[in-house]
Amino acid sequence: MVLEIFRKPKYVTVRPEKTETTQGNERRDIPEGLWVKCSRCNEILYTKELDKNFKVCHKCNFHFRLNAQERIHMTLDEGSFQERDNELITLNPLNFPDYQEKIQSAQKATELKEAVVTGEGTIGGNPVVIGVMDSHFIMGSMGSVVGEKIARAIERAIEKKLPVVLFSTSGGARMQEGILSLMQMAKTAAALAKLDEAGLLYVAVLTDPTTGGVTASFASLGDIIIAEPGALIGFTGPRVIEQTIRQKLPEGFQRAEFLRKHGMVDMIVNRPQLKDTLANILSLHGTN
């Protein structure tokens, strides 16, 4: 009997009962998308305040990536944009596996037909032909439709005697289209050569990231080349370069600040000042 007493559990199990939560202590779910963390400094940012600041972190000046619609809204005068060549669609000329599904998925996610939006509008009252790439669409890769839309935009600028502003953000040529994708480098460069012969202005704006075939073609051919702070700009990644040359690359290699220091970029402009900077450049070149 005595031994049984000592064998009994020395604890009591308490089962919590469900009680009605008082109104004051009720849990309130925070809506998704209300806050966002800065990728550079980890600051928690209020989305509405971030949008007011052109999607630039107020603490470390990190420039978040924009989609094409956001870029157009921030750059062009309100109500002035007229889109062109939106009817062009991408095919699968090489019958690359799952390419069509990838295109459809990107179209659904971005509400775009391709990785670039082109058209006409005004910046500070200055008429301009504009092209804006979107890295959210298959990483802004350049396929046949992207190259065609940019070439047509440049040709339209020549016809109407207007300056061209192209915003670049891309992972390079689109591998699913093979040589047809690489051909767009020559096509866009040739169109810009005609623009130059016509004596018209081309301003290239390089945003994060601008790499591969886009860097090796129209992105680097501007009469004036502007970059956003911290933008990654280059042909291939630093790891590949280090493995090839067997040397350690300098700090900040392929970033906008490094390229500005070494003469590859004319100026670095913070996003909130970018529209005014473009308007001043266009006015100085007599486009108004």
Curated annotation (Swiss-Prot):
Keyword field: ATP-binding, Cytoplasm, Fatty acid biosynthesis, Fatty acid metabolism, Lipid biosynthesis, Lipid metabolism, Metal-binding, Nucleotide-binding, Transferase, Zinc, Zinc-finger
Record pathway: Lipid metabolism; malonyl-CoA biosynthesis; malonyl-CoA from acetyl-CoA: step 1/1
Heme in keyword set: no
Database matches in Pfam families: Carboxyl_trans, Zn_ribbon_ACC
Keyword hit for Zinc: yes
Binding partners and assembly: Acetyl-CoA carboxylase is a heterohexamer composed of biotin carboxyl carrier protein (AccB), biotin carboxylase (AccC) and two subunits each of ACCase subunit alpha (AccA) and ACCase subunit beta (AccD).
Name of the protein described by the UniProt record: Acetyl-coenzyme A carboxylase carboxyl transferase subunit beta
